[in-house]
């Protein structure tokens, strides 16, 4: 998890939070909301990836550390705060959600690549009842379930998936 946390994020806000579900009781609870029952039941662990819509509240913690570690001055931090406060105030709730989804997606790919490099497998799951997850895990309303990630060792190879070629996806101007 710490290795995945170095993933880049918008303004370095790191809006991801997660719940590691690795007990039979926890997996049974998550199973009530996870449409992928097989992965839920057979994985070593499931991660519930959450997006924190109150990410700006971590400003002092994140940028205070940058000052303490000598990466920026207090003056630069405060100038950055002023600019970001204006941006945050002008940002709609929907845009905040989009930014959090985007950043959590980057974290997920970082995590999946690290898991694979360590010899394990993962499956990223978007098919689940987000409202039910919020209820089951009694999440604060600032936290939104983004995706589930199954982790373990695969018993057999998955069927190959097909991919479109870049030439069918790209335009040049």
Residue ranges, per PLM feature:
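Acidic, surface-exposed loops and disordered segments
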Residues: 1-173
């Amino acid at each position: 998890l710490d290795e995945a946390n170095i993933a880049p994020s918008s303004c370095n806000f790191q809006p991801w939070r997660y719940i590691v579900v690795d007990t039979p009781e926890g997996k049974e609870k998550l199973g009530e909301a996870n449409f992928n029952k097989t992965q839920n039941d057979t994985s070593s662990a499931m991660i519930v990836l959450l997006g924190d819509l109150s990410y700006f509240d971590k400003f002092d913690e994140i940028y205070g550390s940058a000052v303490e570690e000598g990466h920026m001055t207090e003056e630069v931090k405060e100038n950055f705060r002023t600019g970001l406060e204006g941006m945050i105030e002008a940002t709609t709730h929907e845009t905040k959600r989009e930014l959090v989804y985007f950043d959590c997606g980057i974290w997920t790919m970082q995590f999946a690549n690290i898991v694979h490099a360590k010899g394990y497998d993962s499956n990223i799951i978007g098919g689940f009842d987000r409202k039910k997850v919020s209820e089951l895990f009694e999440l604060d309303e600032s936290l939104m379930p983004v995706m589930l990630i199954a982790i373990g060792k695969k018993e057999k190879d998955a069927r190959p998936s097909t991919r479109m070629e870049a030439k069918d996806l790209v335009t040049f101007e």
